[in-house]
Amino acid sequence: MARTVNCVYLNKEADGLDFQLYPGDLGKRIFDNVSKEAWGLWQKKQTMLINEKKLNMMNVDDRKFLEEQMTSFLFEGKDVEIEGFVPEKGQE
C-alpha cells in the first residue's frame, strides 16, 4: 500500500515519497509533508533554475540558493521566477 501524506504544497492527501530524498531536518520535513507529485513539480523548477542561472552544485552558495528556493516553493507557496520563461497556456 502506498504511503500517503497531507501535502503542504497541494493542500491535499497524496502519495508520499518512497524514501527521504534530501538530507537532514529539511529532508525529514520534505519526506513527512511533500507528495511525489509536488516533488516532481519542484524537480522541474529546480532543473530550470540550475540551467538558467548556471548554478554549480559544487558551489556552497549555489546549493544554499537552491535550497532557499526549494523551501519557498514547497512550504511557502512562492513560485520560482525564471527569467525569460513563459509557460504554455494551461500549464500555469
UniProtKB/Swiss-Prot annotation:
GO molecular function: iron ion binding
Keyword set includes Iron: yes
Protein name: Probable Fe(2+)-trafficking protein
One GO process term, biological-process aspect: cellular response to oxidative stress
InterPro entries with a match to the protein in the record: Fe_traffick_prot_YggX (IPR007457), Fe_traffick_prot_YggX_sf (IPR036766)
NCBIfam families referenced in this protein's UniProt entry, alphabetically: PRK05408.1 (NF003817)
Protein function: Could be a mediator in iron transactions between iron acquisition and iron-requiring processes, such as synthesis and/or repair of Fe-S clusters in biosynthetic enzymes.
